[in-house]
């Protein structure tokens, strides 16, 4: 996307394409972080400004500070801190170039006012969230995914879970927590068709979490038994096919796992419990 995935967008989405058991909140490289967060268009503009500052005729000490900061940015996300931005701004080329006076026309003032009010609006929502007033922050700024996720974990009824999960998925459909919540709500009302759809979406975004597969099996096993008791063999067979397919899904995940995933401390472990294997053997 030309304007990136947004703040924490990569962290929220990486479960859908990861090839090992890991969790990455920051990539520890400011250039890559900018590309992920704000996209390639703003990043290119930033690179042009920095390169211009490096080649410009300005004090050597300013260039040394700038190059040192840039070198460290390749190993950490320094620009997450406002103070680092201030240092970067001081080191940019402010001494050369043409001076141009811009008159503030009515349209320009209107745009400035909208930007200021928008920043204040988002800032109020963020301040409420970081001060622990999650519900109030969502009322002010309902597009805060993290706040929505906190409210989801606090939901007490299936209706509340569904409502918060839908709001989260409207913002980012790669969040497994929301799909799990919808599956749990569907399980509570006995809608196993929805359970299958929602758990498959959850598994697509949490490929290396064994508990997800076990939870799916447990829900399907209950569905299978209930359908058999009701004489609905067609629906029971759908549940059974999904149960048997769990191991096939695991095999596909392991086949696509990167070789490096087996060399780190947290290695993939997706061995289903004996209860699963016994169930499959008994119903072949």
Predicted regions and their residues:
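Structural signature of transmembrane alpha-helix termini at the membrane-water interface
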Residues: 48-58, 71-78, 94, 124-127, ...
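Membrane-interface micro-motifs in multi-pass membrane enzymes
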Residues: 26-30, 34-41, 75-88
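Alpha-helical transmembrane signal-anchor/signal-peptide segments
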Residues: 128-143
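TM-adjacent membrane-interface loops and short helices in multi-pass inner/ER membrane proteins
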Residues: 1-24, 31, 38-44
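Internal/C-terminal transmembrane anchor helices
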Residues: 104-129
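C-terminal luminal/periplasmic domains and tails of membrane-associated envelope-modifying transferases
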Residues: 141-284
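Transmembrane alpha-helices of multi-pass inner-membrane enzymes
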Residues: 58-112
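Hydrophobic transmembrane alpha-helices and their immediate junctions
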Residues: 40-67, 211, 217
């Amino acid at each position: 996307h030309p304007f990136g995935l947004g703040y924490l967008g990569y962290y929220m989405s990486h479960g859908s394409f990861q090839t090992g058991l890991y969790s990455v909140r920051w990539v520890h490289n400011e250039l890559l972080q900018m590309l992920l967060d704000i996209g390639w268009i703003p990043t290119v503009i930033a690179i042009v400004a920095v390169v211009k500052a490096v080649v410009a005729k300005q004090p050597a000490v300013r260039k040394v500070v700038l190059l040192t900061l840039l070198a460290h940015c390749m190993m950490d996300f320094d620009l997450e801190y406002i103070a680092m931005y201030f240092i970067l701004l001081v080191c940019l080329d402010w001494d050369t170039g043409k001076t141009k006076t811009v008159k503030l026309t009515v349209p320009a003032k209107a745009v400035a006012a909208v930007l200021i009010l928008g920043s204040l609006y988002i800032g109020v929502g963020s301040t409420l969230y970081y001060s622990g007033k999650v519900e109030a922050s969502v009322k002010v700024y309902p597009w805060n995914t993290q706040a929505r996720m906190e409210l989801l974990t606090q939901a007490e009824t299936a209706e509340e879970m569904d409502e918060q999960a839908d709001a989260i998925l409207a913002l980012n459909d790669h969040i497994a927590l929301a799909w799990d919540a919808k599956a749990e709500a569907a399980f509570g009302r006995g809608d196993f068709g929805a359970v299958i759809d929602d758990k498959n979406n959850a598994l697509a975004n949490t490929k290396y979490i064994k508990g997800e597969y076990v939870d799916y099996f447990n829900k399907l096993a209950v569905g299978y038994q209930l359908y058999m008791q009701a004489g609905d063999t067609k629906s029971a067979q759908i549940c059974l096919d999904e149960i048997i397919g769990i191991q096939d899904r695991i095999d596909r995940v392991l086949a696509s796992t990167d070789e490096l995933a087996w060399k780190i401390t947290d290695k993939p472990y997706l061995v289903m419990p004996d209860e699963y294997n016994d169930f499959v053997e008994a119903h072949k």
